[in-house]
Amino acid sequence: MTFWEPRQNMQLPPEIPQARVLVTVKTYPLPSSTYGELVCTAGLLNGEEWVRIYPIPFRFLKDNNQYPKYSWISLDLVKSTRDFRPESYRPRRGIDETIHVDEKLSTGNAWAARKEFVLREVFTSMDELIALAKGPQNKSLATLKPAEIIDLVIEEVDRDWKEKWLAQNQQGNIFETDAQGRMQERQLVRKLPFRYAYRLLSEGDTITNPTIPS
């Protein structure tokens, strides 16, 4: 069930010029054969509707285009044609999109400014979210309030990227300019040698293990 009255689902348009998004999620960079590495971002459009933004070459954005979590950003978005999930968008100009970074919400007063947005619609049942994901809505982003956090699971994984990904990066000949104006090959971000996940108990005694975005 939902915690607080749910909003009516708004049909998001195929194009959103100068979309204003409150960033709440940034994944750890993953290798890309085309762009070197990419990050998936999620947040609340106008502070209300969930959207997913991909691809973004976050580490290679100019400093004034790099955004922290819980900051407002503005950019042109178009619906992703490669992802059936309704919240999924891509920057209109791809990796060349200009991202305007505005204010970052404070953690003061027990995160009051952030809670105002992320707690507007809260689910307490993972079963309900799974049903919505499999149903006509195809819902794939939401805030879940668990009944209990059972454990934090830390699992050791491979310390190096897959050979295929390393080879793709080398074949891509992706370069950047250093401080002296010289061209040099972009280096992949260091791989995290661990996977982190919570074991959660949600309404209905459902135990889940959602992975924590780094």
Task: Explain the meaning of each model-derived region.
Residues 93-100:
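Short edge-strand/loop segments of extracellular domains
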Residues 1-4, 16, 101-214:
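Nucleic-acid-binding small beta-barrel platforms of the OB/S1 family
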